[in-house]
C-alpha cells in the first residue's frame, strides 16, 4: 500500500492503474472508454513463452484502474473489489462495474527454466512448491508439451506474434528469441 504515498498530489479524477509486474494493460483501450469509478482489464494470459496462450484462463482479471477519489487502497482494489469473481457475479460486488475487454496481456513465467524453478520455490502458494513442480526436467517437459506446470490439464496454444501484441515486443522482437516458440 506504499503506492498511496506516491499519489499524494494526484487529483481526484486522475486515473490510477494497479497491476502486477507481468500484467500489461492495453492503454489504447482507454481512448474508447470513460472510466466512471473503477474497471478491470480482461487480459490474455501467456505462459513460459511470449506466444503460448492459455485460452482456458481468459479472461484473466488483471490490471485494475480506478479514479483516485474512489481508491481506498491498492490492496482493497486488488482483493476486495475484483477478487477473481466470475464476470456474471460482478453486480453483487460492485455498482456499475466496467470491463475492458481485450485489455492487455499477462506474461507469466517468461523466464529461464532455472528462474521458473526459483519462482516456484519462493512462491506464497505452498501447494505448488513441491519437488515435482520445481524439477527442471518436469518444467522443460511441460513447456515442450505446451502444458501448464501444475497438472491442471491446461493446454497452451501457440499463436503467431502479430499486431495484437504490445508494441514494445513487436519493435524489439530480436530481444525475445529464447522466449518465442
List where the protein language model places each region.
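Extended interaction regions within the primary functional domain
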Residues: 1-6, 14-16, 43, 140-144, ...
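Active-site-proximal specificity loops/subdomain of glycosyltransferases
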Residues: 1-18, 27, 177-180
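Conserved catalytic core of nucleotide-sugar-dependent glycosyltransferases
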Residues: 23-129
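C-terminal accessory extensions appended to soluble enzyme cores
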Residues: 95, 99-181
Amino acid at each position: 500500500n506504499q503506492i498511496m504515498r506516491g499519489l499524494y498530489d494526484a487529483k481526484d479524477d486522475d486515473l490510477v492503474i494497479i497491476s502486477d509486474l507481468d500484467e500489461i494493460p492495453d492503454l489504447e483501450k482507454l481512448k474508447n472508454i470513460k472510466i466512471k469509478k473503477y474497471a478491470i482489464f480482461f487480459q490474455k494470459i501467456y505462459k513460459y513463452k511470449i506466444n503460448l496462450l492459455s485460452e482456458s484462463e481468459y479472461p484473466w482479471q488483471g490490471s485494475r484502474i480506478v479514479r483516485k477519489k474512489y481508491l481506498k487502497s491498492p490492496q482493497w482494489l486488488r482483493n476486495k473489489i475484483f477478487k477473481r469473481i466470475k464476470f456474471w457475479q460482478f453486480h453483487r460486488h460492485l455498482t456499475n462495474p466496467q470491463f475492458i475487454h481485450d485489455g492487455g496481456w499477462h506474461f507469466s513465467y517468461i523466464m529461464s527454466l532455472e528462474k521458473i524453478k526459483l519462482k516456484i520455490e519462493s512462491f506464497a502458494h505452498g501447494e505448488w512448491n513441491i519437488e515435482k513442480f520445481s524439477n527442471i526436467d518436469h518444467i522443460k517437459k511441460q513447456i515442450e508439451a505446451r502444458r501448464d506446470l501444475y497438472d491442471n490439464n491446461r493446454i497452451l496454444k501457440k499463436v503467431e506474434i502479430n499486431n495484437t501484441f504490445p508494441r514494445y515486443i513487436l519493435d524489439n522482437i530480436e530481444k525475445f528469441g529464447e522466449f518465442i516458440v
